Regions:
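Terminal, low-structured helical/coil segments at or just beyond the last alpha-helical repeat
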Residues: 237-278
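N-terminal leader/linker segments that initiate helical-solenoid repeat arrays
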Residues: 9, 14-119, 124
């Protein structure tokens, strides 16, 4: 997998950041060979303040902490230096520790923040530091499960960093823990069939690897299309970016370069500095 983590309406007529050519306002047609489904739009940005799709910030969390969370998230996607990301995260975690929010919400926020820092270190090729932060994210998610049980939110919060660790650590860890990522996503979907984060975890597991490692690019695109149909109220910026890049990657793996380029350009409208989408 490739890792694949301020509220304005998406303007479909923005100039593509890669070549400054005006992007067509609607996605290119999905070829019949890929499936009968179509992408009618690139999706919208949510107007709500959410930690994850459909999960708002806890009421006791003060506005400066919410603002700092979004700054941290966006800096990760803008490929800021991991040292600056880590410093910002440490400061934010300290800020959150004294705010009147539940232990479960503390654990959720710690898991998400730690995941973002791990992602930043991983993007900058520091495997050791990435592992440290992904492990912290897993520990926080496990604490969340201990406090509230295996809720869909807790399961996807655990599955995402565990998936990263399964790639970064040794083969034994992958064999033991890799299958759990899909299992946790499936379990989340059992009680919440429209859980967007769980669906995206499923789609990513199909969009990025080669077929020998479970890649199924047509199925991935079908899941991504279903997410867009569910997310009528929009998605957080990072989630929408990951979705667009996932669609682009699946099309790229199918050698459909026109479709892939359109979706990469759509992703760059959200984070023009992101190196993967360029």
């Amino acid at each position: 997998l490739i890792n694949i983590s301020a509220f304005v309406t998406v303007n479909n007529m923005l100039y593509a950041q890669t070549n400054y050519v005006l992007r067509e306002p609607s996605p290119p047609q999905n070829p019949a060979s890929v499936g009968k489904f179509q992408f009618s739009s690139p999706g919208l940005l949510s107007q709500s303040q959410e930690i994850l799709p459909g999960i708002p910030f806890p009421k006791g969390m003060m506005l400066p902490a919410v603002t700092t969370f979004f700054e941290l998230r966006d800096n990760v996607y803008k490929s800021a230096t991991p040292e600056s990301i880590e410093a910002q995260a440490v400061s934010l975690l300290k800020m959150l520790s004294i705010q009147p929010i539940s232990g479960s919400n503390q654990a959720l926020l710690e898991a998400r923040i730690s995941y973002l820092v791990g992602r930043s270190w991983n993007d900058h090729k520091d495997k050791k530091k990435a592992i440290t932060w992904f492990e912290r994210a897993v520990e926080a998610a496990q604490k969340m499960i201990g406090l509230e049980g295996e809720t869909p939110t807790a399961l996807v919060t655990l599955a995402e960093p565990l998936g990263e660790l399964s790639i970064l650590k040794d083969l034994g860890f992958l064999i033991k823990n890799g299958p759990k990522v899909g299992q946790y996503a499936s379990k989340a979907l059992e009680s919440d069939p429209k859980n967007i984060k769980a669906l995206l975890l499923k789609a990513s597991a199909l969009a990025y690897p080669p077929p020998i490692w479970g890649g199924d690019y047509k199925k991935a695109l079908e899941i991504y299309a279903s997410v867009l149909s569910i997310a009528q109220n929009g998605l957080p910026r990072d989630v929408l970016f990951d979705l667009r890049v996932g669609i682009a990657t699946a099309y790229s793996n199918l050698k459909l370069s026109e479709n892939a380029a359109w979706w990469f350009d759509a992703a760059l409208e959200l984070y023009p500095e992101n190196p993967y989408a360029k």
